[in-house]
Regions:
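Helical "lid/coupling" subdomains associated with nucleotide-phosphate turnover
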Residues: 2-149
């Protein structure tokens, strides 16, 4: 670990300020939410091309949400088998806020309430990716119980 920051700030804090993010279609803009996060989060001052998401069902989210992804061609790992280019993730997150129906997703999944915080999570992902200069995001379903190397 080159640098680490612990934040006592998360998706539920975002939902308390912007409760519409859990509605079918959000009325608060992605830019507004990202600005709010930028003002409050501490992010390590490191740069990396690849950001791996773990500990929150990120691969499940990518596969069910309409976020476009492709096979991970950067490295071979069965637990990290899909990837998203940052430009695609930004475009698709904007659509996720303004065009993709959470109600439609909730109808087809086993845990509909889990989706309430996903727009807030997406904004966090983009703020961190922006700060570290990530070009690719690798969404995984790896549990944090395994630890981070």
């Amino acid at each position: 670990i080159k640098d680490m920051k612990n934040n006592k700030f998360g998706v539920m804090d975002i939902l308390n300020v912007f409760p519409d993010l859990s509605n079918d279609i959000a009325t608060t803009s992605l830019d507004t939410v990202m600005d709010y996060i930028r003002e409050r989060i501490e992010i390590p001052n490191v740069k990396t091309d690849i950001m791996i998401l773990a500990g929150g069902g990120h691969e499940f989210f990518a596969r069910e949400s309409g976020i476009r992804y492709k096979k991970n061609t950067l490295f071979d790992d069965p637990n990290e088998n899909i990837m998203v280019h940052i430009k695609t993730r930004i475009e698709d997150t904007r659509k996720y806020y303004t065009q993709i129906s959470l109600d439609e997703i909730r109808k087809r999944v086993d845990e509909p309430a889990w989706w309430n915080a996903t727009r807030a999570m997406c904004a966090f992902v983009l703020v961190v990716a922006e700060k570290i200069g990530a070009k690719y995001i690798i969404p995984t379903d790896i549990s944090m119980i395994y630890g981070i190397i």
